Regions:
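Surface-exposed binding/hinge segments that line
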Residues: 8, 22-28, 100, 119, ...
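Short, well-ordered beta-strand elements
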Residues: 30-39, 86, 96-98, 118-121, ...
């Protein structure tokens, strides 16, 4: 098995090179890619952040052991290619994953990359090292990791407590770069050092992030760009006008609403625009330990009060999708089909019938037209959060709940919900990896840091482990759908809808592939070039 998989990696690399060779003749070196950003991150440390505005700009600073092919639109297990690894192999019992490593790779400060760096990174992620991450949002991904062992300087093995076929996909995410052993987590927050195609230059909060070409990159003749500059502008109308005026080459993927995309196409017909299935869901989180929301009947009433289709119609011109925890098809590989989704509590289209039940429950709990429940609805201070939060507040009025909007700066948002410093909130959750292990472990298992509302059902945890071990994909999907139903029955985190955002770029920008089932995994940027 080991020999077969390593050979596969080599052959796959040769095939990619052969396919790419003719196109390479037209590619040009040079130029700075100008991109606007919708917000300012708290730090530059991917492993300590949870928002795309922290991950995407510095994905090009790093490399992974393996990565989803940057030119395949839909992430899937067959689209994983080696990066700092040269291949991989599983043991017969599925509990050991071994990577031979690329030699001659240097960190941006000139020090050599070795197996020690891989071990250091996953010791940090698993919480087993002396130094600790200040925040470790994806620690739950590695709860099944027994440890990482080095075999000399250029081979590592991941030892698991039990089989977990999805581990390779987790390692292929943009959230899974290798960090250098010799740079502290503290320093990585302000000046990250990687092995990737671009070197970090500068981060000025609320202003810009700048990257420059890594002249010593291990992949020869890459990257094509001399650098990338991200400018932070929070006003949607302003940034769209600036893009149309030629100030930027590329919009921030997913941030262009359907109406704004129409504006760009009307005013700048030469622009190339795409609207892909959304992999980010808008959801309702309720602090289950904060009275009166510790009452499951009240939480059920709030879930029944939602008119999901209204969100889609108002915010996406009807182009968004209704879905559960797992991204629905056709963009997602694991989500429930519509006919199954509509059988879940609250997910059917009988809105008025559901709201009548919700009002009956609220009256039984002592609320009504003359005694309305007053709450704060917290959300992140960006349009993609604020706009649906306003609709949520309006809908809750139908069931005797009056909400007051509380907006929170991005740098404070995730720490706030992680420590459960809220009562009711509207949140957005992206599909980091389109696989049940990622979303279920990170957001729904007992005690996970991404489980912002404190949901805990030991029976669900057992099911999550069971599906994680299952090698048969169809059997695993059936288990994942069973978990979806239990989460809906528990009102764990009602999913409202999946957005459908757009992206546009100037015609001289080449080499972009926009992925349909993750906003996080397609931004290594080494193959993007400017036809100028």
């Amino acid at each position: 098995m080991t020999r077969h998989l390593r050979s596969y990696a080599v052959v796959a690399g040769l095939l990619i090179a052969l396919v790419a060779a003719p196109a390479a003749l037209a590619q040009k070196q040079g130029g700075i890619l100008r991109v606007y950003m919708i917000d300012s991150p708290a730090s530059m440390s991917i492993h300590e952040e949870s928002t795309v505005v922290a991950e995407r700009p510095v994905m090009g600073v790093f490399n992974n052991l393996v990565l989803f092919d940057q030119h395949v639109k839909q992430n899937n297990p067959d689209a994983i290619v080696p990066e700092l690894a040269t291949g991989w192999s599983w043991s017969e019992d599925g509990t050991e994953l071994t990577f031979p490593l690329r030699q001659g790779v240097k960190w941006h400060d000139g020090k050599p990359f070795t197996a020690k760096d891989v071990k250091c990174t996953w010791d940090l992620l698993a919480g087993r090292s002396e130094e600790k991450f200040r925040i470790n949002p994806r620690k739950a991904w590695y709860r099944n990791l027994e440890g990482v062992a080095t075999n000399g300087d250029y081979e590592v093995s991941f030892h698991l407590k039990r089989p977990q076929p999805a581990l390779l996909e987790l390692l292929a995410s943009g959230w899974s770069p290798v960090y250098p052993c010799h740079v502290s987590p503290r320093d990585m927050r302000s000046h990250p050092i990687g092995t990737g195609p671009f070197k970090f230059v500068e981060f000025k909060p609320n202003e810009h992030i700048r990257l420059t070409r890594n002249e010593d990159y291990w992949r020869k003749d890459r990257p094509y760009l001399d650098g990338v500059e991200y400018t932070m502008l929070k006003n949607r109308s302003t940034v769209i006008l600036a893009f149309i005026a030629g100030k930027y080459d590329l919009t921030f993927a997913g941030s262009v609403t359907i109406p704004l995309m129409h504006d760009i196409q009307n005013q700048m017909p030469e622009a190339i625009c795409q609207s892909n299935p959304g992999s980010v869901n808008t959801n309702l989180i309720i602090n289950r330990s904060a009275p009166p929301f510790d009452n499951p009947d009240l939480r059920r009433a709030m879930a029944l009060g939602l008119d999901r289709k209204a969100f889609v119609d108002i915010l996406t011109e009807g182009q968004g999708n209704l879905g559960g925890v797992l991204q629905p098809p056709p963009g997602g590989l694991w989500g429930l089909p519509t006919e199954v989704l509509q059988t879940l509590p609250g997910y059917g289209l009988e809105v008025e019938k559901n709201r009548a039940k919700a009002r009956q429950t609220m009256q039984r709990l002592g609320y009504g037209p003359e005694n309305r429940l007053k709450i704060k609805v917290s959300t992140r201070d960006t349009p993609s959060y604020r706009d649906p939060a306003v609709i949520l507040i309006d809908q809750l009025k139908q069931i005797y709940i009056d909400g007051e909007l509380e907006t929170v700066d991005t740098t404070r948002w995730y720490p706030k919900v992680m420590r459960k410093d809220y009562t009711v909130a509207l949140n957005l959750t992206g599909s980091t990896v389109d696989d049940p292990d990622q979303g279920l472990y990170e957001n729904y298992t007992c005690g996970a840091i991404g489980n912002y509302n404190g949901y805990c059902n030991p029976e669900v945890d057992k099911l999550v482990d069971r599906q994680s071990m299952e090698a048969d994909r169809e059997k695993r999907k059936a288990l994942a759908w069973e978990i979806e139903r239990k989460l809906a029955e528990d009102d764990a985190r009602p999913i409202i809808y999946y957005n459908r955002g757009g992206i546009c770029w100037r015609p001289e920008v080449k080499g972009i592939t926009v992925m349909v089932n993750s906003i996080y995994n397609g931004w290594r940027m080494e193959d993007i070039w400017l036809d100028k």
